Regions:
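Phosphate/NTP-binding elements of NTP-utilizing enzymes
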Residues: 1-179
Length: 179
């Protein structure tokens, strides 16, 4: 994408404070995903990535979500094909937010199955949802993450995309594993 500046380095510093380190290829993608126009809007409102299993895709998504929450106060909707995957991602991200240098930003963590959320003091939040035909109804946010995008169907996509339509600076990220 063509962007004037990127907050990728800010995001990397933030992650490092919480004990996470991005690989160079992840940093390149993060720079693109966090690329901004002169007006401060996302240079890419729809992004994607196809990453083989066990190569750092989840860390990349967690990093983008974390940057959105801490740097921009975003409301994030993370979706996965299965609730098991959504819950596993929640557990990993909760661990990051429990880091001694990061926990001061946390207001509340909700752990009820299927309703997991991390809410920050700045108003940012992330919800972890399984994609269902009606799973996106009534949701709202700024960043929509479609993990396991190779498994999404038209009904689930139609359910979730309106969730970010009211955002002043929406972004949708599709990632998956090659077949």
């Amino acid at each position: 994408p063509n962007y004037q500046r990127s907050d990728g380095l800010k995001a990397a510093r933030l992650l490092k404070a919480g004990g996470l380190q991005l690989d160079p290829w992840q940093m390149d993608i993060m720079d693109d995903w966090l690329g901004l126009t002169p007006a401060g809007k996302w240079a890419s409102t729809t992004c994607g990535g196809s990453v083989p299993r066990q190569n750092g895709k989840t860390l990349l998504l967690q990093s983008r979500a974390t940057a959105g929450m801490l740097l921009y106060g975003e409301e994030v909707i993370y979706t996965a094909h299965l609730q098991k995957t959504a819950t596993e991602t929640f557990e990993e991200l909760r661990e990051f937010f429990e880091h001694p240098k990061i926990i001061k930003h946390v207001k509340e963590v909700k752990t009820a199955l299927g309703r997991e959320q991390i809410i920050l003091k700045n108003g940012a939040r992330i919800k972890f949802l399984a994609r269902t035909r009606n799973g996106g109804r009534g949701q709202h946010g700024d960043l929509l993450i479609i993990d396991e995008a190779q498994e999404i169907d038209e009904n689930a996509q139609a359910s979730f995309l309106p969730a970010i339509s009211a955002s002043l600076n929406p972004q949708t990220i599709y990632t998956g594993t090659p077949p």
